[in-house]
Each structure stands twice: as structure tokens, then as C-alpha cells.
């Protein structure tokens, strides 16, 4: 259980949020950049998978298969983490010529996290609310909760990176 909390929640989701907000703060002065309609192959995959995720989660929830819904959400989180590694925004930030690509990547990350937060809302409402807050979304946007379509993250939104949303648990076996 401790390992699952540390890996799935802390490493996969918590680090994704924290890394993304840190990069938006560092490279875009804390403002979600305008993506100017650009979409790379990897970006198109994120959009396509988010639509597929919507169908998968809807089907699982309709059939009361909550663990299947969570599995689908975590598969998407894994894809977004892979997107970070493939896109290497920290490398893109070093060259002025790749600024548009950097903006696309950071927008896609913020939008993916917004969508993830909406999917986890029924399972972890407090975590989803904190993610919305750190993404700079207003309570109205947070309660709108049904806007799971790609493109709901408004460029120009000021992010508010807080403390990591999950703390690491230590396990000690007593003799």
C-alpha cells in the first residue's frame, strides 16, 4: 500500500503536476503559454488518447468498474509522463528557435493535467481541487467539471504552484 501511494500518487501524478508547474514558472513566468494551434505528432497522441480516455472512463463508471476507470486514468498519466521525457522541455527552453515548440509542450502538459484532474474528481475530490487551484483555475471552472474536451485550459492562466500534493510515506517494519 505504501509503495502504491508513493509510486502511483506521488511519483506518477504528483511529480507530473509539480514538474509541469515548475517549468511553466521557470520558462513562461508562471503563465500557461499560447500554443498557437500547433500540434506535433506526440501532441496529437495526447489529444487522441484523452478522447479515448473519456470513453473508457465513462464506460467503466457506467458499469461500476471503478478500478478499471482508475487503471485507464493511470495509463493516461503514464503517457503524459512519457511525453515529458520525449519532448524534453528543459532542452527546448535553451534555444530561442524552439520557443513555439516549448509553448506547445507546456500547454499540452497543463491541459493534460487539467483533464486528469477532472477524471480523478469522483475518486479524490480534495486532490482534484488542489490540482485545479495550482493550475490557476477558478472555482467556476472547477465545478464545471464536465469540460473534459481538449482545449479547455486557457492560455494566459497564471499557475499557482504550491507544495507537492502527495507526501512520500516511509514504511518501517518492526522486528
Residue ranges and their predicted role:
Residues 59, 63-65, 74-175:
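Basic, alpha-helical terminal appendages of large translation-related enzymes
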Residues 1-39, 138-165, 169-172:
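Catalytic adenosine-cofactor/nucleotide-binding cores of aminoacyl-tRNA synthetases and other
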Residues 1-9, 52-71:
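Extended, non-catalytic structural segments that build the interaction scaffolds
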Residues 17-57, 77, 81-98:
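Conserved, charged catalytic cores of large soluble enzymes
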Residues 10, 14, 47, 51, ...:
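Generic structural concept
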Residues 3, 10, 39, 43-47, ...:
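Short, surface-exposed loop/turn motifs that are enriched in glycine and acidic residues
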Amino acid at each position: 500500500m505504501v509503495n502504491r501511494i508513493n509510486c502511483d500518487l506521488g511519483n506518477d501524478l504528483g511529480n507530473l503536476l509539480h514538474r509541469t508547474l515548475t517549468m511553466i514558472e521557470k520558462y513562461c513566468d508562471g503563465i500557461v503559454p499560447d500554443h498557437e494551434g500547433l500540434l506535433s505528432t506526440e501532441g496529437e497522441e495526447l489529444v487522441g488518447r484523452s478522447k479515448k480516455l473519456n470513453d473508457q472512463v465513462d464506460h467503466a463508471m457506467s458499469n461500476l468498474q471503478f478500478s478499471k476507470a482508475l487503471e485507464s486514468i493511470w495509463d493516461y498519466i503514464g503517457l503524459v509522463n512519457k511525453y515529458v521525457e520525449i519532448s524534453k522541455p528543459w532542452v527546448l527552453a535553451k534555444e530561442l528557435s524552439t520557443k513555439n515548440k516549448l509553448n506547445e509542450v507546456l500547454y499540452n502538459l497543463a491541459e493534460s493535467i487539467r483533464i486528469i484532474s477532472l477524471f480523478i474528481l469522483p475518486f479524490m475530490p480534495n486532490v482534484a481541487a488542489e490540482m485545479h487551484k495550482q493550475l490557476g483555475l477558478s472555482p467556476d471552472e472547477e465545478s464545471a467539471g464536465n469540460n473534459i474536451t481538449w482545449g479547455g485550459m486557457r492560455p494566459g492562466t497564471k499557475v499557482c504552484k504550491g507544495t507537492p500534493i502527495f507526501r512520500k510515506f516511509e514504511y518501517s517494519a518492526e522486528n
